[in-house]
Amino acid sequence: VVGSVNEDILRRHQIRETIKTHLERERQLFARGIKVLSLFFIDHVDSYRIYGKDTAEKGKFARMFEEEYQRALQELMSTFKDTAYTRFLSNPKNAPENIHDGYFSIDKKGKNVESKNKEGENEERGFDLIMKDKERLLSQSCPIRFIFSHSALKEGWDNPNVFQICTLKDTSNEIKKRQEVGRGMRLCVNDKGERQDADVLGDHVFDTNILTVIASESYDDFAKKLQTDMAEACASRPVVVTATLFADQLAPVSYTHLRAHET
């Protein structure tokens, strides 16, 4: 029981930090028409939503989220100077119970199911549910800004505006960790669908496209190592591509490969 209580305290702290980081990032990007999304990966579906025969109740993470979001607004609202943003936050449409949702596996009857026993099969069935709202999630007219998922969303979801990833679980599977962290490694887009890359932002591309991982210690160590590995891998890459880069670089041509691209 003590262990469970201590873990709940840790998870609540992670949720709180994710919300605060989200609000600060959202404050910075709101006027530029860039919607900020946060993604939570959870251990079991019933940690977020508990299904009865004909009803569904909020799980502990959903309750924690709404409590901590309301608390964060009370603490931070007076520090926000952008009146358009404060009106956005105060809009009843953006009340705590409306801004989060869970995307999980679904059975043939369209009901959410616990996927821990048939993880691969059920995650695959859940991808379609996530993809249906992919573009709508990027609009401020959609109140959902916080997403809870059981799966790693590996090849089924590619939303560019995930700025925070919070892992409310522990795992030693490094492949799955890479899949989860990879959900936030995208160049964001604004409300016009314009990708915020170096052509648009110049050097500020690095100030805008920042991913924050709020994690337990195992994920924190992993994220730092991944960042180091990526920095080392990119260090030797040329900043500008010129003709001299390809001097004396001869490579065999694969006609099978070319045909594959043409078809």
Q: Could you say what each language-model-derived stretch is?
A:
Residues 238-255:
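Intrinsically disordered, low-complexity intracellular terminal segments
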Residues 52-60, 163-169, 180-184, 226-232:
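Short secondary-structure boundary/capping segments
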